[in-house]
Amino acid sequence: IIGSTGSGKSTLISHFNGLNRPTSGRILLDGEDITALSITERARRGISYAFQQPVRFKGLRVGDLMNLAAGKDANIAEVCAYLSEVGLCARDYIDRELDASLSGGELKRIEIAMVLARGTALSVFDEPEAGIDLWSFQNLIRVFEKMYEQTRGSILIISHQERILNIADTIVLLKDGRLAECGPREEVLP
């Protein structure tokens, strides 16, 4: 999903995850109307969401958060694999608290690892490249490519980064809160 600042991108995806309710229309997930469902019910149905500004969970350790995301007691090897996939050394992070000692980029990568651990039907990312350094950005592209190849679900990304747009199969362009264009990348971004 692309569009200028204030075009409604974040508002649109806040309807998918249940943070906001639409004033008209319906939201369907695999043919099921989820418009009236709560955030929790939508998460149970398979929607995960990575915020533009990740949330800090004070008092919780990274390993605990990963277990919550996986929905089970993930073993150390699984947690390490998710953290490694987003470019974090698991040994350095698994026992760290999710507090002010973590940078925005570290939190962003932990949040992306959480989405990977959930393995949901719809993974929504709001500007996932925000606050991430160049090396991590290169790795982020690989993470999305791998998710796309290995998942049966859908990945929805709000971004302006050309390298992320280049891996998209469909681009949605919003303008003034309305759908301006939608189609294959080659047609929307000539």
Question: Which stretches of residues belong to each language-model region?
Answer:
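Helical segment within the ABC ATPase nucleotide-binding domain
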Residues: 137-150
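Q-loop/switch helix immediately C-terminal to the Walker
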Residues: 53, 59-75
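Conserved ABC transporter NBD signature motif
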Residues: 25-32, 45
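Helix-to-loop junction immediately C-terminal to a conserved catalytic motif
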Residues: 17
